[in-house]
UniProtKB/Swiss-Prot annotation:
GO terms for cellular component: cytosol. NCBIfam families: PRK00179.1. Catalyzes the reversible isomerization of glucose-6-phosphate to fructose-6-phosphate. The keyword Lipoprotein does not apply. The gene is pgi. It is an enzyme of class 5 (isomerase). Its EC number is 5.3.1.9. This is Glucose-6-phosphate isomerase. It is found in: Cytoplasm.
Length: 550
């Protein structure tokens, strides 16, 4: 079981605080000037697929060593063992945390409550494979005898963000003749606009809800069912066009779905980690089951690296402790994930959920309020779009924003010199953020342009870049199912490590519940014309204004 250790009370934390104070004026430029081989010392490569360069960070060898010592002191090794062995480390829900078992391609036994879960995991995978084969071969036909051409995944949170992100990232691997669509928002616009794009005769809906009671998902599912029956006019045809990713067989059957087309998963699979489970069916249908298996395999490879590698060379651990350094010692409040690959445009949003839902906690594993920072704000957009939007603040603003830059060495679309131009920006941005531009350089540039110092004195301060902004550069040989699996697992395990260090429970999400409870109480009040007075004056005023306007 996870130990309950307040990180701020450890020896390593105290030593890191001393090091932070002693290195208050540390400059990335000085670190490189003092060590021309810094890149070699502060980069790691994984299986010729990923290169992680963390040399452009505000860390010395001594700081790095103490950060790893912090991981040792909070018993990260024991926590890793507890995760992979099926211990119930999700204590508040009394559950194991075993998304790693879903991608356990070595098929070694994994036990929960004395039962090896791998036979059930493999059975669901085989069922998914058979289902994909039927759809892709045209054997599965709609109510008019036509083959399926469109998949509509109806879910929310992990049942939507993950599958959408992966199918977008792996669009070059899309099965010909199959288009995927994703509906999540309970705003009727989302389902209406999606249904306008598809044909009821050739569309297969996947309803992704473990309990089959999720409000947003079931509202959209019933609207899709009603839309479908407006054309099909026979409820028995629902079974030809709907499948379920759920464990509630009774509710699935009542909806009209054949329970043989219900794909189950387990309570030890968290929603934000569920792409590795039956929730990944939309991925498998979109990119092909063989490619889905390669995705699983890539994640398993990173899991093995994480489980077996010493901390000094362990990529998720390294990224995690660097994040702790900025979050808890430098006072950084956010981290940016910046993929230089258009297919990866939803990757930052996916790990916005993955990180903030996991580590956005203010209570430690002892049930006490923490007096230190936990999870950071995660955000980002693809490059180079972000360069023309928010990079200004990262370069010259007043906030420290550590950034992860991600780019593939090889493009799926090698058009002209597009990729060289993209990568030139990828390389240039981390260099600019680290080293900046001095006043002397700015003055020399103006002089070369024939300007006198007097003419441009008012401009010079605005053109100086202080630099010293930390980044990690993650170079991928190519975005493939394998490397994407590795990247996702890398970030997942980074999040786990940080949760262990911060002494919080990373696998519950009670913060999601309160708003849902209150919405359930408010909904009946919206069905009457009467003014409400049962809330605070702000909420009453908003509800009553809505009633007057609707």
């Amino acid at each position: 079981m996870l130990k309950n250790i307040n990180p701020t009370k450890t020896v390593a934390w105290s030593e890191l605080k001393t090091l932070f104070d002693a290195n208050a004026d540390l400059k990335i430029s000085t670190l490189f000037a003092n060590d021309p081989q810094r890149f070699k010392a502060f980069s790691r490569q994984f299986d010729d697929h990923l290169l992680v360069d963390f040399s452009k960070n505000l860390i010395t060898e001594e700081i790095f060593t103490k950060l790893l010592a912090l991981a040792e002191e909070v018993d990260l090794k024991g926590a890793i063992k507890a995760q992979f062995s099926g211990e119930k480390i999700n204590v508040t829900e009394n559950r194991a945390v075993l998304h790693s078992a879903l991608r356990n391609r070595s098929n070694t036994p994994v036990f929960v409550d004395g039962e090896n879960v791998m036979p059930k995991v493999n059975a669901v995978l085989e069922k998914m494979k058979a289902f994909c084969t039927k759809v892709h071969s045209g054997e599965w036909k709609g109510y008019t005898g036509k083959a399926i051409t469109d998949i509509v995944n109806i879910g929310i949170g992990g049942s939507d963000l993950g599958p959408f992100m992966v199918t977008e990232a792996l669009r070059p691997y899309k099965v010909e003749g199959i288009d995927a669509h994703f509906v999540s928002n309970v705003d009727g616009t989302h389902i209406v606009e999606t249904l306008a794009k598809v044909d009821p005769e050739t569309t297969l809906f996947l309803v992704a809800s473990k309990t089959f009671t999720t409000q947003e998902t079931m509202t959209n599912a019933h609207s899709a069912r009603e839309w479908f029956l407006n054309f099909a006019e026979d409820e028995t045809f629902v079974a030809k066009h709907f499948a379920a990713l759920s464990t509630n067989a009774d509710a699935v059957a009542e909806f009209g779905i054949d329970v043989d087309n219900m794909f189950e998963f387990w309570d030890w699979v968290g929603g934000r980690y569920s792409i590795w489970s039956a929730i990944g069916l939309s991925i498998a249908l979109t990119i092909g089951f063989d490619n889905y298996e390669v995705l699983l395999g890539g994640a398993h490879e990173m899991d093995k690296h994480f489980e077996e590698t010493d901390f000094e060379n362990n990529i998720p651990v390294i990224l995690a402790v660097i994040g702790v350094w900025y979050n808890n010692f430098h006072g950084a409040e956010s981290e940016a994930i910046l993929p230089y690959d258009q297919y990866m445009h939803r990757f930052p949003a996916y790990f916005q959920q993955g990180n903030m839902e996991s580590n956005g906690k203010c209570v430690d594993r002892n049930g006490e309020s923490v007096d230190y920072q936990t999870g950071p704000i995660i955000w980002g957009e693809p490059g180079t779009n972000g360069q023309h939007a928010f990079y200004q603040l990262i370069h010259q603003g007043t906030k420290l924003i550590p950034c992860d830059f991600i780019a593939p060495a090889v493009s799926h679309n090698p058009v002209g010199d597009h990729h060289a131009k993209l990568l030139s920006n990828f390389f240039a941005q981390t260099e600019a953020l680290a080293f900046g531009k001095s006043k002397e350089t700015v003055e020399a540039e103006f002089a070369a342009a024939g300007k006198t110092t007097e003419e441009v004195a008012h401009l010079i301060p605005s053109k100086v870049f202080a630099g010293n902004n930390p980044t990690n550069s993650i170079l991928v040989n190519k975005i493939t199912p394998q490397t994407l699996g590795q990247l996702i697992a890398m970030y997942e395990q980074k999040i786990f490590v940080q949760g262990v260090i911060w002494n919080i429970f990373s696998f519950d999400q009670w913060g999601v519940e309160l708003g849902k409870q209150l919405a359930g109480q408010i909904l009946p009040e919206l069905t009457t014309v009467n003014a409400v007075d049962s809330h605070d004056s702000s909420t009453n005023g908003l509800i009553n204004a809505w009633k007057a306007w609707k």
